């Protein structure tokens, strides 16, 4: 039997407790545990990765800034953005970090192609871009051969908070979102398409819908 990827669709959840839930999942899992992907949205928050520099947070205002343990620099999460946390046994999948990042990017490119949007990845700047504007960000952490954190895809959101930072450390980085490219977006349909892309590109045999939430403490 091939590997399954389990999906939890969690709705809108606060950032910090969700981050701690990821950490617990990775710390407590063993080789028998199914890999999971959590699909969700966050209230407005800036997260500063391990490589982040304070000067890239320009004027956060009333939006909190949280220092976290993923790779990369500062980014923004908010309602209308699809965040997907990838809790994967990378060793079991037989993937190196660069290959994992590439396959996640290809999943997003494939998803966007299903909406007739031509997107590309950049070797020097992880993420996915449409006509030079960033539509999706990536940031991962690997611990004991297992990944956490993941991707953020802009669907139908207020992009103005990105102007308060240098996204991923790039001053003036233009941002875009699916709504501005194709019109109204069905969040649930995007989730369905992304699930299929991730299962295919990451090499799973099938997907499974996991019921129940996560412990937010």
Curated annotation (Swiss-Prot):
Family annotation (PROSITE patterns): BPL_LPL_CATALYTIC, LIPB
One cellular component (GO) term of this entry: cytoplasm
Subcellular location: Cytoplasm
Signal peptide location: none
Recorded GO MF terms: lipoyl(octanoyl) transferase activity
Catalytic activity: octanoyl-[ACP] + L-lysyl-[protein] = N(6)-octanoyl-L-lysyl-[protein] + holo-[ACP] + H(+)
A Gene Ontology BP annotation from the UniProt entry: protein modification process
UniProt domain BPL/LPL catalytic: residue ranges: 31-206
Residues forming the catalytic site: 168
InterPro entries: aa-tRNA-synth_II/BPL/LPL (IPR045864), BPL_LPL_catalytic (IPR004143), Octanoyltransferase (IPR000544), Octanoyltransferase_CS (IPR020605)
Keyword Cytoplasm: yes
UniProt pathway: Protein modification; protein lipoylation via endogenous pathway; protein N(6)-(lipoyl)lysine from octanoyl-[acyl-carrier-protein]: step 1/2
Gene3D superfamilies: Bira Bifunctional Protein, Domain 2
Keyword Acyltransferase applies: yes
Lowers pKa of active site Cys, annotated site positions: 134
EC class: transferase
Keywords (A to Z) from UniProt: Acyltransferase, Cytoplasm, Transferase
EC number, UniProt record: 2.3.1.181
Source domain of life: Bacteria
Function: Catalyzes the transfer of endogenously produced octanoic acid from octanoyl-acyl-carrier-protein onto the lipoyl domains of lipoate-dependent enzymes. Lipoyl-ACP can also act as a substrate although octanoyl-ACP is likely to be the physiological substrate.
Family annotation (HAMAP family): LipB (MF_00013)
Protein family per UniProt: Belongs to the LipB family.
Note: In the reaction, the free carboxyl group of octanoic acid is attached via an amide linkage to the epsilon-amino group of a specific lysine residue of lipoyl domains of lipoate-dependent enzymes.
Official protein name in the record: Octanoyltransferase
């Amino acid at each position: 039997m091939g590997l399954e990827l389990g999906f939890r669709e969690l709705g809108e959840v606060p950032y910090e407790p969700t981050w701690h839930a990821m950490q617990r999942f990775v710390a407590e899992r063993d080789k028998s545990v199914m890999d999971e992907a959590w699909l969700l949205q966050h209230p407005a928050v800036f997260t500063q990765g391990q490589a982040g520099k304070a000067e890239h947070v320009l004027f956060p205002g009333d939006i909190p800034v949280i220092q976290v343990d993923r790779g990369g620099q500062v980014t923004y999460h908010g309602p209308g953005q699809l965040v997907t946390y990838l809790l994967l046994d990378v060793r079991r999948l037989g993937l190196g970090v660069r290959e994992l990042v590439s396959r996640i990017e290809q999943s997003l490119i494939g998803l966007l192609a299903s909406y007739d949007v031509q997107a590309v990845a950049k070797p020097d700047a992880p993420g996915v871009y449409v006509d030079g504007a960033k539509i999706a960000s990536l940031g991962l952490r690997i611990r004991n051969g297992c990944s956490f954190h993941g991707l953020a895809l802009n669907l139908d959101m207020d992009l103005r908070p990105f102007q308060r930072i240098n996204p991923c450390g790039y001053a003036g980085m233009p941002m875009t979102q699916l709504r501005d490219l194709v019109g109204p977006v069905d969040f649930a349909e995007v989730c369905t398409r992304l699930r299929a892309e991730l299962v295919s590109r990451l090499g799973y045999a099938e997907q499974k819908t996991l019921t129940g939430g996560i412990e937010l403490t």
